[in-house]
Amino acid sequence: DGVDVATILAEKASDEAITSVSGLIRGAAGTTVTLRIGRGDATPFDVMLTRAEIVIPSVEWRMLNDTVAYIRISEFKGNTPEILATGMRELATQQPQAYVLDVRGNPGGLLDSAQAVLGLFYAGTALWEERATGVQRELLTIAPSDAFAQPSVPVVVLVDGGTASASEVVTGALRDRYPRTTVVGTQSFGKGIVQNIYPLTNGGTVRLTIAQWLTPNKSAIHGVGIMPDIIVNDDANARATVPCVANRQPADGETLCRDPQLATALGLVN
């Protein structure tokens, strides 16, 4: 099969067009796809690719400068705490004076993964689960299986409207329980309920909400979200002043990126 990338994007270079191209390119591992690529006024050319499974790590880390460590969690998977522990041990050798934890666009994932991630920062209450009956149950952080030195330096958490569910649990818990936590960005999504799915005799299903999640200080998450301590919109017209993270790319001729939320975080901890 073939995908004329040049024609599709030339007709409408939009998010919808990019999604359309992506859908056409995807397929079973081992199969091939031919792409027609156009560059400027040059004659388009064909490239045949063999499809393969792409594994995107849920955690990435780096030093942004000599003193600030950056961690991005894109999703809370089963192995996320283990990978994060590896990253934090590696970063600790460089003695960071602050951490920036980026959960922008993180849709959530496994609750026990979030509890174990919190266990890398502190021991204690991770969240409360409030049943429909009003009964509240305390859920604790999950300690790492190996010896681990929890950090004691400031943490800035970056959030936006795509920060949801388990990532909101982590954000709220760090603000409530980890000293010197500051939340920067825009209001999070506000998804914090537990639902059971029951099958119906007609083949349908019904979702029944049985509980909601509360932060350690018993603040609701669902329908409310996490309101940042410092509200910073992602302004496309901002100056390019910070290292490029979270798949951001610099503009032509530049090496830094426009990311006012990260710039604010660095201003707080530098």
Cite the ranges covered by each PLM segment.
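Short acidic, Pro/Gly- and aromatic-enriched capping/linker segments at domain boundaries
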Residues: N202-Q212
